[in-house]
Amino acid sequence: MTVKALTQISSAGRNGVGAFVLQCKKLDIHYSDWAGSSRGMNGFIKSLLPKFAAANPQIEFVVSPRPAKHPILMGHYINGRTKAICVRNMEPLEILKKAELLRDASGEKPQKFKKPVTSTNPSVRGVWSPYHGQGMAV
């Protein structure tokens, strides 16, 4: 019997069965020391990032400079997708909210729902129509 490597750690559809697996596995933080648009990112890296990284030990944080470019946060997910958010001219607290958004995201593409409620079973009562039943007396 041969041993095969896992292609994925977990799927988003079965998360919660057994144990919770955080979908974000890596967070890349790119900044520039020279550009003025990275002022908030530099403040985030110095003040808020150590606490955020300590609170989330299951995520790998990579901080790397990108000279003369706008700062970005890039999340890598266990399903293989990545999401990037440009955080130019943002304050450190706004960048923290964007980092939390990337941490909590599933990594899946946004899906458009045709109906506000999705169900596998149709309604027992059917769809309401003003043309059925007694109607209104005028």
From Swiss-Prot:
**Keyword vocabulary terms for this entry:** Mitochondrion, Ribonucleoprotein, Ribosomal protein
This protein's GO CC annotations = mitochondrial large ribosomal subunit
The record ties this protein, via SMART domains, to: L51_S25_CI-B8
Its principal location?
mitochondrion
**Similarity field:** Belongs to the mitochondrion-specific ribosomal protein mL43 family.
Q: What job does this protein perform?
A: Component of the mitochondrial ribosome (mitoribosome), a dedicated translation machinery responsible for the synthesis of mitochondrial genome-encoded proteins, including at least some of the essential transmembrane subunits of the mitochondrial respiratory chain. The mitoribosomes are attached to the mitochondrial inner membrane and translation products are cotranslationally integrated into the membrane.
**Name of the molecule in the record:** Large ribosomal subunit protein mL43
Q: What organism, scientifically named, is this protein from? A: Neurospora crassa (strain ATCC 24698 / 74-OR23-1A / CBS 708.71 / DSM 1257 / FGSC 987)
This protein's encoding gene:
mrpl51
